[in-house]
C-alpha cells in the first residue's frame, strides 16, 4: 500500500542555496521532516541552475519521509535575466523598461513548456509574451 501524504509544501528557493533558516526550516519543521536531508538533496539537484529561483513542491508522508519535485524558474525571472533588467515596470502601460527578441522569447517558452498548460511552443510563446508585456518588457522582432 502507498504511503499516505499528510502535507504538500510549496516553496520558491534560490538554486543550490537552501539552508535550514526561514522559510525552509519552519515550513518543514512543523511537519517533522529532516530539514538537513532536504537541503542537501535540493542543493545537489539544483546546483547547475545557480542564480535562478527554483520552485519546489514537497510531499510529506505520515512516516515523516518526503519526496519533492522541482519546477522550472518563474517566467518573470527568465524574462528579467534575458532583458538584462533588475525588475519589471510598476507601470507597464506607460512604457517599457527593456526588450527581448523573438529568439529569446522562444528559448524561455521552451524552458517553461513542461510547467505551462500548453501543448505547443507557439502557445507557450504567447503566454510568456503576455507575462513580458505585463512586466513592461517589449518584444522586438
Curated annotation (Swiss-Prot):
Q: Which domain of life is it from?
A: Bacteria
Q: Which Pfam families match?
A: Ribosomal_L11 (PF00298), Ribosomal_L11_N (PF03946)
Q: List the GO cellular component terms.
A: cytosolic large ribosomal subunit
Write out the coiled-coil annotation as residue ranges: none
Example of a GO biological process term: translation
Among the GO molecular function terms of this UniProt record, one is:
large ribosomal subunit rRNA binding
Which keywords describe this protein according to UniProt?
Answer: Methylation, Ribonucleoprotein, Ribosomal protein, RNA-binding, rRNA-binding
Tell me its family: Belongs to the universal ribosomal protein uL11 family.
Quaternary data: Part of the ribosomal stalk of the 50S ribosomal subunit. Interacts with L10 and the large rRNA to form the base of the stalk. L10 forms an elongated spine to which L12 dimers bind in a sequential fashion forming a multimeric L10(L12)X complex.
Among PANTHER family, the record links this protein to: 60S RIBOSOMAL PROTEIN L12 (PTHR11661), LARGE RIBOSOMAL SUBUNIT PROTEIN UL11M (PTHR11661:SF1)
User: What is the protein's name according to its record?
Assistant: Large ribosomal subunit protein uL11
Report the source organism.
Synechococcus sp. (strain CC9311)
State the organism's lineage: Bacteria, Bacillati, Cyanobacteriota, Cyanophyceae, Synechococcales
